[in-house]
Every structure is written in structure tokens, then in C-alpha cells.
Amino acid sequence: MKYQLTVMEARVIGCLLEKQVTTPEQYPLSVNGVVTACNQKTNREPVMNLSESEVQEQLDNLVKRHYLRTVSGFGNRVTKYEQRFCNSEFGDLKLSAAEVALITTLLLRGAQTPGELRSRAARMYEFSDMAEVESTLEQLANREDGPFVVRLAREPGKRESRYMHLFSGEVENPPAVTDMSNAADGDLQARVEALEIEVAELKQRLDSLLAHLGD
């Protein structure tokens, strides 16, 4: 595939895509903002602990590959970064809002079921029903310039198959592990996680507002 990202590059791109939609007032992001987003404990799998130098290296590489661009001047005291991975003026990759939400959530959390994706992507795009989630996944799997996602074999005890993005290469289906937890439990967990993410974002916005008022 034309688009190939390392694990850390996928995390950086996913974070910028997420923040562009969920916290536009804080976007583009500084290096520190990207570090914080990459190391979030909510809506991240796996949880990472990247250093500023590690993140800066990824940012530099992605700028060279034209997946990001720097923004400076016009009142910005520090260099900030915005994504050019998709939907940029001169880029080839064009995605709908629904597709961006699913791709972002897959970049940030890895393989997930349609039910998990619907709950976890809700802050970026509100799917009307599960049929819309599944049809969007199928579109991503069958695009002429793709495929961008793949459906994995259903695990024993699971009602839904998981999907994974293909921006980091082909995916090997992991060995099936017998797990009798049902889809309802998975959906409940996903809803709880979505609420935790919303609380964390609200706290971040409050801290930013208080810091601004203190200036």
C-alpha cells in the first residue's frame, strides 16, 4: 500500500486526526501537545510513554514524508503541527467524516469490533446505527485506492468480528483465544471508556481555560 506507518507514526497521526475534530480550539498541536496526546491513558491501546525526543523524531519524519506540516508565525510562539495525511488540499487520500472517525479510532486502539468502534468514535462522528458503521467499514475495505481496513476472523465466543487498519502493513490474524464474554459486555465497556475520554477532554479544556485566564 502507498501509505505505510510505523507504530509510533500511526499513534502521532491518529492523535492529530482526533484532536483536529474533538478539540479544534487547541489544534494544531505543539510538540508537548502531541506528547500528551500520544501518552493519554484513555482511548489508547497500547498505552505509551513516549519522550519528547521520540515524538519529535516521528514528527520530523512525517513532515519529510508530507504527512504533516509545521505552522509557525502569526502569533504562534512555538512551532505547531497539523496533519496532511488525509483531506489536505494537495493530498490524494480523501475520506468522509465517518471514515476519518473509524480510521482514527483504529490507529489509536488497534483491532476492534464494529460495536466498539461506534462507541469509541462517537466524539468524532455519530453513526446513526450499526448498519452505517458496517457499511463504512466495507467501503474502506473495498476502496480502489485501498484497501484500508481488513476484517479479521471471528474469535470463539464473540458475536462480532474485529476490524484492523492496514496503514502499518498486512495484518496477521492472531491465534483465537476462547473468550466467552459476550458482545453486550464489550459494548458496555466501550461506552464507559467513551465517557472517561469525554471527562478527560473536559478536564483538559478546563485546565487550558484556567491557564489562559491566569495569563
From Swiss-Prot:
Keywords, alphabetical: Acetylation
Keyword Acetylation: yes
Recorded superkingdom: Bacteria
UniProt modified residues of type N6-acetyllysine: K80
Pfam families: DUF480
Leader sequence residues: none
Family, per entry: Belongs to the UPF0502 family.
Name of the protein this chain belongs to: UPF0502 protein YceH
The species this protein was found in: Escherichia coli O81 (strain ED1a)
